[in-house]
UniProtKB/Swiss-Prot annotation:
Residues 322-336, 423-433, 512-536, 600-615 have a biased composition (Low complexity). Belongs to the protein kinase superfamily. CAMK Ser/Thr protein kinase family. It comes from Dictyostelium discoideum. One of its GO terms (biological process) is signal transduction. This is Probable serine/threonine-protein kinase pXi.
């Protein structure tokens, strides 16, 4: 990056003009120190950004906007210093804290107080819109008080996600904080200035009742529940209804909002709303507990959060504590990148494998899997991932039962060994490397889990290959030993065993029946089972085909499933009754959320099998991790996302694929190993009883 990327920046050392004080804020991409002008003694906040970390275009855009803006209710950029390695912003220092933090300290709070606040914020947005600037991330965290006095004024900050929007084409970047995000942003239909009015509506709602208007139970259905809204004026409800209209063309404009009687103060209530203060304190505490960082953006790496800028906000150590909490949670569950886990998440571990995708474009790794409206994640759930179930018959002490059990166990063992060979080369797993398969997809797994894209899933490929080879070799040795023991039992058994030809014919018949059943059932997207009269080996095929033509594989479902509102906004594309995908609100961006893929739902497509010479071969190209990654990559390419975002997504997809394949393969081999041990134990038991 060149030396002078900011026009008009000061090249001389900042130490000549400012006394740099202690660090008052810290983030991944910037540090904030207190500063004192040596000439005037005026205190400022000095934000230091490394050129090697923060993207050049983002710095230039934010500085250009802040330089153009001059409003008493917007934090002012005073000076810009630049060195070979750093850009230093001298900002107006505010010490009064966030909007909600200030309000919850009050003992007396009325509708009129809320009306005054909303009126001020609306005028600030009117000023920005007059300059064709859309803030895109209007929320309480970005509304700060200038100081701690009673005369303190509100200041709007953080223009890292702001965009210019004239009368031309609409904006399409996926930016903002989900709790305050307008539906047209999450639906990717294009948006403009009305998104800021929607955010004002959400803030107004919270200011009057203490909690957000939408969650996973309501979607975008606006409600005024009792008793919280019983003492709130109809005029306030009228304003909120106008601001929270799902149709941006029918939503209140800036002028309509400012002219509304409630904003003018003529119809708002004067009585204290103590209940709202109590609820708001709870909401504010919960918001803080979840880290406060719920923003998603097209280029969040190039910006810092409000918590990094001013001393009145979260202490510096909280960033490290949050990171430690995230790391601890990640270690507790390989499939979660979560701040908190469900209390019953470890139950039915062998029946359900839930994988969470945080497709936050800023790739933030703070995700929450609670159902308490505190987070936004995407869950792709595949039930019954255990592909093979083997049930063995119990042996009895009678001689006849022992003999029957031995014969059954022999047949079952041989069948299981055959199936192990079949599965290693068909739809269940492929133990060969991508190179051996001609690059045709590498390792494939039935019902592959889509793990989170929000954390680093990096895993060295050479270590993965080494582990695979060791496990494969170990299984081969165990198989060989089991076969030898089986032959030994045949020779030592005093009971006449089935003739070789009879056994071969019996197994061949079972194998042919298996093929026919598989062909019939798989074509119907169902499960296949083989009943040999002694035990049942059941296989369930649950293909995941993220087709670009499938509703469940659409960009809105894969990328925006975290939105708790998409289910109502796009109900033409998503069938909630069939549980193809269920969206709720969560906090990686704000509140609650889950994506549920029902078994055999319309979101999955099943391919037909090819039958040749009495055997079938699965079309593995439509299954497995590689296919899912390719489908996701295809969907991402349609969005015209920034290059740096696409590069990051590609990297994470690649790392995810390696990690997921390694984990799934190990699980498969462990199951096979346990199965062989059980059969071996059964054979030994039968042998001892026989003696």
């Amino acid at each position: 990056m060149g030396k002078n990327i900011i026009a008009g920046s000061i090249s001389s050392s900042i130490h000549k003009s400012y006394e740099i004080g202690s660090q008052i804020g810290n983030g991944k991409f910037a540090q904030v120190h207190s500063g004192t002008n040596k000439s005037t003694g005026k205190k400022s906040a000095i934000k230091i950004m490394k050129k090697s970390i923060v993207e050049e275009s983002a710095i230039i855009k934010e500085i250009e906007m802040m330089t153009e803006i001059n409003h008493q209710n917007i934090i002012k950029l005073q000076e810009v210093y630049e060195t070979d390695n750093e850009v230093l912003l001298v900002l107006e220092l505010v010490t009064g804290g966030e909007l909600f933090d200030k309000i919850v300290e009050r003992e007396f709070y009325t509708e009129q107080d809320a009306s005054t606040l909303i009126g001020t914020v609306t005028k600030v947005i009117q000023y920005l819109h007059s300059k064709d600037i859309v803030h895109c991330d209007l929320k309480p965290e970005n509304l700060l008080y200038s100081d701690n006095s009673d005369q303190a004024i509100i200041k709007l900050c953080d223009f890292g996600l702001s965009q210019r929007c004239g009368s031309g084409s609409p904006l399409r970047s996926l930016v903002g904080t989900l709790t305050y995000m307008a539906p047209e942003i999450s639906s990717c239909t294009g948006y403009g200035k009305p998104v800021d009015l929607w955010s004002i509506g959400v803030i107004s709602y919270i200011l009057l009742c203490g909690f957000p208007p939408f969650d996973e139970t309501t979607g975008y259905v606006l409600e005024f529940p009792s008793p919280e809204w019983d003492n709130i004026s109809d005029s306030a409800k009228s304003l909120i209804k106008g601001l929270l209209n799902n149709d941006p063309s029918k939503r209140f404009t800036i002028d309509q909002t400012l002219k509304h009687p409630w904003i003018a103060g003529t119809t708002c209530g004067k009585n204290s709303i103590v209940g709202t203060l109590k609820t708001l304190r709870e909401f504010n505490t919960l918001r803080r507990t979840n880290g406060g960082n719920t923003t998603m953006g097209h280029n969040k790496q190039s910006r810092s959060t409000v918590f990094e800028l001013f001393p009145s906000l979260t202490p510096i150590k909280s960033n490290d504590e949050n990171n430690n909490n995230n790391n601890n949670n990640n270690n507790n569950n390989n499939n979660n990148e979560i701040l908190d886990k469900k209390s019953n998440e470890n139950e039915n571990e062998n029946e359900n494998d839930k994988i969470k995708i945080n497709l936050e474009l800023n790739l933030n790794n703070n995700v929450n899997n609670n159902n308490n409206n505190n987070n936004n994640t995407v869950i792709l759930e595949n039930n019954n991932n255990n592909l093979e179930k083997i049930s063995t018959t119990k042996t009895t002490t009678t001689t006849s039962t022992i003999n029957d059990s031995i014969n059954k166990t022999k047949i079952q063992l041989m069948n299981s060994l055959d199936f192990e060979n079949d599965s290693s080369s068909s739809e269940t797993y492929s133990s060969s490397s991508p190179i051996e398969n001609g690059g045709g997809g590498g390792d494939k797994f039935t019902s592959p889990e889509l793990s989170s894209l929000s954390i680093d899933l990096g895993c060295a490929s050479d270590q993965l290959n080494s582990d695979k080879e060791k496990i494969i070799e170990q299984l081969k040795n165990e198989k060989s030993l089991l076969q030898k023991e089986l032959l030994e039992i045949k020779r030592q058994s005093p009971v006449p065993s089935p003739s070789s030809s009879f056994l071969n014919n019996h197994l061949q018949q079972q194998h042919n029946n298996n093929i026919n059943n598989n062909n019939n059932n798989i074509n119907n997207g169902g499960s296949t089972s083989i009943n040999n009269g002694n035990g049942t080996i059941e296989r369930q095929f649950r293909p995941i085909h993220m087709s670009k033509d499938s509703d469940s594989g659409s960009y809105e479902n894969l990328l925006l499933g975290t939105s708790p509102f998409v289910k109502n906004h796009n109900n033409n594309n998503i069938n909630n009754n069939n549980n193809n995908f269920c969206h709720s609100r969560n906090s990686s961006f704000g509140y609650g959320n889950s994506y549920n893929s029902s078994n055999g739902g319309s979101g999955c497509s099943s391919s037909s099998d090819e039958s040749t010479g009495g055997s079938f071969k699965k079309d593995k190209s439509k299954y497995g991790v590689d296919r899912i990654c390719l489908d996701l990559q295809s969907e991402f390419e349609k969005l015209s996302l920034p290059k740096e975002t696409m590069d990051k997504l590609a990297s994470v997809l690649s790392n995810y694929k390696q990690k997921n394949q390694e984990k799934s393969l190990k699980v498969k081999y462990e199951k096979q190993k346990d199965k062989y041990k059980k059969l071996k134990s059964q054979l030994k038991k039968d042998k001892s009883l026989l003696k």
